Regions:
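N-terminal flexible segment immediately upstream of the FAD-binding catalytic core
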Residues: 1-72, 89-119, 134, 148, ...
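Residue-level detector of anion-binding/catalytic polar loops
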Residues: 79-80, 142
Length: 193
């Protein structure tokens, strides 16, 4: 098996953990910042469980403004950030790093709008893939990119990984089924594409 080459650990970040956690706790509610070993344990891996590492901290923001402020702070302090949807990916996209913040997007779990006339849904990144299908199936619709993890995987993770499933042969993968995204860049800038 090939070893995953990981970035070199920045010891200066590890030495500043308490200062970083304190600042992050000012950017979101304190209960949304996890930093104790027992709190971090569930985040030591994604579905690629052959690799485990405890993140510096986990931050669970509740809105775009908080994400923007967290990323702006981390960018200004050269703190790595690993975004995480539901952690169901097998490609290593959400692997935690010892000197990085894991930015969990699970609290962004609302469907904001369903527009049947234009065949589109506006959703936050933490909504599950299957959650979208359940929301529209009573009108005869479903969300076609359906990975085997559709019960638990998040739309944000689907976008990040360009997920697909058995229906992708006919309807394409995630990029073929989205009209746009709002995302926060690493410097905290909010962009729409």
């Amino acid at each position: 098996m090939t070893e995953i080459a990981l970035p070199k650990i920045d010891i200066s970040i590890l030495n500043r953990k308490s200062e970083i956690v304190k600042k992050l706790s000012k950017l979101t509610d304190r209960e949304n910042v996890l930093s104790e070993s027992d709190e971090l344990r569930p985040y030591e891996t994604d579905a690629l469980s052959v690799y485990t590492q405890t993140p510096l901290a986990v931050v669970l923001p509740e809105n775009t403004k908080e994400v923007s402020e967290i990323l702006k702070y981390c960018h200004s302090q050269n703190i790595k950030v690993v975004p995480r949807g539901a952690g169901t990916g097998l490609s290593g996209g959400a692997l935690p790093l010892q000197d990085a913040i894991l930015l969990g997007l699970g609290k962004f779990n609302k469907i904001l709008e369903i527009d049947y006339k234009n065949n589109c849904v506006v959703t936050q990144p933490g909504v599950t893939n299957l959650g979208i299908t359940h929301a529209v199936e009573h009108k005869g619709f479903y969300y076609a990119p359906d990975p085997s993890s559709q019960l638990a995987c998040s739309i944000g993770g689907n976008v990040a990984e360009n997920s697909g499933g058995v229906h992708s042969l006919k309807y394409g993968t995630t990029t073929n089924n989205i009209l746009g995204v709002e995302m926060v860049m690493m410097d905290g800038t909010v962009c729409r594409f």
